[in-house]
Amino acid sequence: MPIFDEYGVLIFAGAIILLIGLAIVLPLSLKGWRRWPSWLALLVGVGIYFLVPLAQPPLQNWALGSFPSDVSFFIRTITLALLAGVLQELIKFLFLGGFRLLFSDNILWIGAMLGLGFGLGEGFYILYSIRNLTYSMPSFVFFLDRASAILLHIDLGFFLAYGFKRRITAAALPLVIVLHTASVYLGLLHVDKKISMWTAVGVGLAASFVLYLVAICYYFKDQRRPLKK
């Protein structure tokens, strides 16, 4: 019975995370749902997230081990955040580049779906990681935090795709790395008890929503704007 309870909670909470993600990305395009590359990008996004737990912890541990014992909190924390931002956005960038070569017509929607999949993969991984802590449903703030993270990954996937489409990846990639780094830094401030979880989630959700509105504006603006030759 405990196993059933544990996995019942996992399935139900995972379904909530999935519905949150789909509800967030839907306003960007209704037509995109009928195109199979969108679903492929979603599945690839989920899959490539699992490269992160393999590569990111060793990289961050190496960085921590190379610091002197008296390194400042800011240097330590911003380095960990930057490593996470660089690694995760480079993974998205490389796979999105492959999609750009294969499916160039709808790359903005594909970028958003790849970001959605990445955010869902992160949510499923975190949910599975905490499965032994409790048999009850995760708290409301947990789902708010996951909504914020999914929203951010959709935003960043879109901005990367926009960079590919408009041939400005040299600007888009550093931008998304900075935004991702800022988000991780905010979370680390909570982990180190510098700010409350509600503050971290609230600020993160507000910032992700603003970026989401920017992405929507750019998406519909792009539909009316010819590509540069």
Where are the regions a protein language model picked out?
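Hydrophobic alpha-helical segments at protein termini of multi-pass membrane proteins
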Residues: 1-229
